[in-house]
Amino acid sequence: MAMHDPHEKNGPDAVESRVQTDFPVERFGGNGSPGVRRIEVISSQFNLVHRIIFFFGVFLIAYVYGLDGTIRYTYQPLATAEYQSHSLLATVNVLRSVIAAAAQPTAAKIADVFGRVELILLSIVFYTVGTIVEASANHLYEFCAGAVLYQIGYTSVILLVEVLIADVTSTRSRLLFSYIPALPFLINTWISGNVTSAVLKVTSWQWGIGMFAIIYPVCTIPLLAVLFVGHLKARRANPQAYKFSLLDQGVGQFFIDLFWYLDVVGILLLIAILALILVPFTIAGGAVTQWKTAKVIAPLVIGVLCVPAFIVWERWCPHPMVPFKLLKDRAIWGALGIAVMLNTAWTLQGDYLYTVLIVSFDESVMSATRITSLYSFVSVITGTILGAIVIYVRRLKPFIVAGTLVFMAAFGILIRFRGGADGTNHAGIIGGQILLGFAGGLFPYPAQASVQVASKHKYLAVITGIYLATYNVGSALGNTISGAIWTQVLPGELENRLGNATLAAEVYANPFAFTQVNPVGTPDRDAVILAYKHAQRLLCITGICLTVPLIAFSLCIRNPRLTKEQTLKEAEEIDDK
């Protein structure tokens, strides 16, 4: 096993790259897969300058998709309201989460087979095309189609930057460097509201989304450039270790192997299960319940039938999407449980938060955008400080457990402060989001780091993809539950409090238009505020209930001592059992 020149290892706790030349080249999977071998060879050529450019490139990409995500999160309610379908906001979010859940493990395998650079290029295509479709959509279904394409690109690049960082860092420094993609939230939290307001003053939300079809591809250039330079140096320095072919057995056999390795059938079954079961819950409610209609019953039945088919398939197929061997370790399944419960609970309070801030708290667009970003802002500050502490403490579990307990306390505050235009409620919702963000800095990223250090490097991309997939499954579940509660509860509350079915339907379809002509203090606005407060209260109560299993999962994970190695020696032993 070749070790690169120690003088080249200039990053803080940078892991020594391991270029293997003494094993047979496998076509797919393992250390022999082209993507894994390629990044090991490339990173072995990095000096200090290359590493600085590398991390700057990661930061720049993260800055752009982070700003875009924050702004798009604000514009999405406006878009659905413009289509007179604001209540279907959860449906759009469920579709995005379903695609993200399926895309994560798929993108991880693509990164292993074809390479990290190729995944960046693929993400650019989907991100750009999806953004253009969303910005030019005239109907909700067109907007959803664009959101799905955008989500594939967005999901792929999020996975990629986390995998790249894990590729070149040690176990004890990984948490600190994992926060590089999150650092832009320190800036975006405060400027996103200004950008959102400025765009809406001079143009429409369509341009606010569409401009990133140009900005994002341009900002990927520095990272692509440094990886390309590493690629050229690697080919010159060690051509034998870099020499491999995906087509050595012919094009036809390659696509057959790729079909099995990517587990295409498993991906389709997973999408079918999540979409067909979860989406109906977000559309069945409303002013007139639709639970007995075919468009709700049929997808539910088909989705349920797909569950046993998925389990049987994953047990039988040669390259399952879910690596059952790894899931036997509580270090893995405990962290995956944290990911699901965390995002389910967070999404419950966050899905309609922007709308509640505008309608119930009477916040401005700028203020509402900033408040919805407070979680990310505070969690990044907390997590970055924690990452530096972990380098010396070398343990993760105590912080993860503490974070889940604080997370529960934050939900208690959010249940208390869920609406009202006075200063007390304004301070209360801000305090709740800050405490939620503090908790978010203590355990989501540490849980991801813990699942990475428990696996060999050859499983790194796949296990990171599985973790992020379960994260998005949590989002899908949260979106579904919030959408179901919102559509089942809010229409009746509005009608009861307003005493006018027509006005209630108008508010339900487009609450933002209603707030513009009905200021706080008018009878109708006060009635609407009470209705929205009631719905948000139910969402937050459901969320705090889910923090109980969240805490339980945090107690189940392992507490290994972190080292300067890329993975722990214990991980090698666990995976080989």
UniProtKB/Swiss-Prot annotation:
Glycosylation positions in this chain: N500
An individual GO BP term: intracellular iron ion homeostasis
Transmembrane segments: 46-66, 87-107, 117-137, 145-165, 175-195, 209-229, 264-284, 293-313, 331-351, 373-393, 397-417, 427-447, 461-481, 537-557
Primary location group: membrane
Gene Ontology MF, one: siderophore-iron transmembrane transporter activity
Annotated family: Belongs to the major facilitator superfamily.
GO cellular component: endosome; plasma membrane; vacuolar membrane
Protein's job: Major facilitator transporter involved in ferrichrome (FC) and ferrioxamine B (FOB) uptake.
Localisation: Cell membrane
Keywords carried by this UniProt record: Cell membrane, Glycoprotein, Ion transport, Iron, Iron transport, Membrane, Transmembrane, Transmembrane helix, Transport
Domain of life of the source: Eukaryota
Gene designation per UniProt: sit1
Membrane topology, as annotated: Multi-pass membrane protein
Matching Gene3D superfamilies: MFS general substrate transporter like domains
Protein's name according to its UniProt entry: Siderophore iron transporter 1
Signals that turn on the gene: Highly expressed under low-iron conditions and down-regulated under high-iron conditions. Expression is regulated by hapX under low-iron conditions.
